[in-house]
UniProtKB/Swiss-Prot annotation:
This is Hydroxyethylthiazole kinase. It is an enzyme of class 2 (transferase). Its EC number is 2.7.1.50. Pathway: Cofactor biosynthesis; thiamine diphosphate biosynthesis; 4-methyl-5-(2-phosphoethyl)-thiazole from 5-(2-hydroxyethyl)-4-methylthiazole: step 1/1. GO terms for molecular function: ATP binding; hydroxyethylthiazole kinase activity; magnesium ion binding. It catalyses: 5-(2-hydroxyethyl)-4-methylthiazole + ATP = 4-methyl-5-(2-phosphooxyethyl)-thiazole + ADP + H(+). The gene is thiM. Keywords: ATP-binding, Kinase, Magnesium, Metal-binding, Nucleotide-binding, Thiamine biosynthesis, Transferase. The lineage of its organism: Bacteria, Pseudomonadati, Thermodesulfobacteriota, Desulfobacteria, Desulfobacterales.
């Protein structure tokens, strides 16, 4: 899908000033409308645990999912898809090889990629896979919890399974201390202007948690939305990664895609929590909230902290 010249310029951060709230909301909903209109085909290779709800969430948003992980499908699916989402949960050897093939093809075809490094930092095996995948595609968004994202910086940071063991501020400090670069990738040292050098190899980072932090070169936005119920069901983070790929399929701006997906998913969670009686009824209401997402709900609920990175 060619989006050149057809992208809203949301300009989430202008120097140190926040974008006007309604302009931000309108820009996010414009991307929602574009997904519903264009129905981008999102190729998702995800873990066995969340395949069904991930596909349903994409459909609810308005995108079209394909969930193939056959090596024989890789070339064709790469050609026809509009975005790729790689989730490295259940990292069986054959699946990892398919992921590498798909990311290589996406790079060759300049397709947008979202990488979810599930469990990175929890042992050498997963961390090694995550770093190998991270190196493959240049046009990508990384989406994970603070522990997973920080494990990609090369620091000796370990996690407990797939659980997050870092708070947002600690993660920000780790990322800020992971070298800082100018746009040419030249190291500046941590005391000079620049941004975390991990962003030289990724258009944006989504660090998910109680609050979501989105980073791009020169930009940082923190969203204070969501509900604790999202931690009581499996797959909400994996779903966010797939939704991010859908947004990235309809805009060339990775930061816009990351912010829009994070906002929509978190607000859908809030709406679902108000109707659900517990985890068992949360997910159906979450799907309904994605399907019925509108600009009014976004405007009423979006809570943003935004600063220059």
């Amino acid at each position: 899908m060619d989006n050149e010249g057809n992208n809203p310029t949301l300009s989430f951060v202008n120097g140190n000033s926040m974008i006007e709230h309604q302009t931000l909301v309108h820009g996010i909903f414009e991307l929602c409308a574009r997904i519903r209109d264009q129905k981008p085909l999102v190729h998702v290779v995800t873990n066995f645990v969340v395949m069904n709800q991930t596909a349903n969430a994409l459909l609810a948003l308005g995108a079209s999912p394909t969930m193939s992980w056959a090596q024989e499908d890789a070339a064709y699916m790469s050609k026809i898809s509009d975005a790729l989402c790689i989730n490295m949960g259940t990292p069986v050897k054959g699946r990892i090889e398919v992921m590498k093939t798909l990311m290589t093809l996406a790079a060759r075809m300049d397709k947008p990629v979202v990488l979810d490094p599930v469990g990175s930092g929890a042992g050498a095996y997963r961390t090694g896979i995550a770093k190998a995948l991270f190196a493959l595609a240049p046009r990508k968004i990384i989406r994970g919890n603070a522990s997973e994202v920080c494990s990609l910086t090369g620091t000796n940071y370990t996690t407990r399974g797939i659980d997050n063991t870092l708070d947002l501020e600690h993660a920000r400090q780790i990322l800020a201390g992971h070298g800082r670069t100018h746009g040419d990738g030249e190291e500046t040292g941590t005391d000079e202007p620049g941004w975390p050098s991990i962003l030289v190899s990724a258009s944006s980072l989504i660090v998910s948690g109680q609050k979501d932090m989105i980073l791009a070169p020169g930009r940082r936005m923190i969203l204070d939305n969501g509900t604790p119920l999202m931690n009581s069901v499996t797959g909400t983070g994996c779903i966010l990664s797939a939704l991010t790929a859908a947004f990235y399929a309809v805009t060339d701006n990775g930061f816009d895609a990351a912010v829009a997906a994070s906002a929509v998913a978190a607000i859908a969670g809030e709406l679902a929590a108000e109707k659900a009686s517990g985890p068992g009824t949360f997910m159906p209401h979450f799907m309904d909230a994605l399907y019925n997402m509108n600009e009014k709900n976004l405007a009423a609920r979006l809570k943003v902290e935004s600063t220059a990175s």
